[in-house]
Amino acid sequence: MIKQLIAEFRKQNGRHPAIFDHYEEDQNCLWHCLHMARTQNLCHAPEYLRPGKSEACAARSFFRDTRETLHAIVFEQFANSPEHREILLFNDNLACAFYTDHYNVFVTVRGW
């Protein structure tokens, strides 16, 4: 679901499709989302980034459904942050994951 929203965001901004075929890095993103949920702390994990990669993280209170919340994260939070926007739009390779707990949605996107 998050990959489709990022692809839609890229398309609306005139960017070509990103390559999302990175299972191992997607799992690393999921691990980071779980860590943020467990600690209830929005944080970055630079020590786990490989050279040349950048990371965007977000947390948002859960709306009525997961898709609506993820849409707000991509099209509002990430879109309105120059650094996060750059990661989504100007990296050819992206890995991402999200995790929903009872009250929040946590997202990690890594680009290179």
PLM regions and their residue ranges:
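Extracellular disulfide-stabilized recognition modules
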Residues: 1-15, 51-52
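Short, surface-exposed glycine/acidic/tryptophan-bearing loops
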Residues: 25-70
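Non-transmembrane alpha-helical segments in soluble domains
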Residues: 6-7, 30, 34, 58, ...
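Disulfide-stabilized extracellular recognition modules
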Residues: 64-112
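Soluble non-cytosolic domains of exported or imported proteins
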Residues: 1-4, 19-27, 64-73, 78-79
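Surface-exposed patches in mature extracellular/periplasmic domains of secreted proteins
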Residues: 12-28, 40-50, 84-101
